[in-house]
Curated annotation (Swiss-Prot):
Family membership: Belongs to the bacterial ribosomal protein bL34 family.
GO BP annotations, alphabetical order: translation
Protein name: Large ribosomal subunit protein bL34
InterPro entries given in the database record: Ribosomal_bL34, Ribosomal_bL34_CS
Key words, A-Z: Ribonucleoprotein, Ribosomal protein
GO cellular component: ribonucleoprotein complex; ribosome
PROSITE patterns in the cross-refs: RIBOSOMAL_L34 (PS00784)
Keyword Ribosomal protein belongs to the record: yes
Gene Ontology MF term list: structural constituent of ribosome
Pfam family, one: Ribosomal_L34
Amino acid sequence: MKRTYQPSVTRRKRTHGFRVRMKTRGGRAVINARRAKGRKRLAI
């Protein structure tokens, strides 16, 4: 049985990237929460 995490830069950006986050209201809320917390990386 193979491991579940098979890294792919493309898939990572498409599902968790900054532009994807900005598309939905919830995603923008995530970005704002991370900004308020002072995260160095807002999105992957």
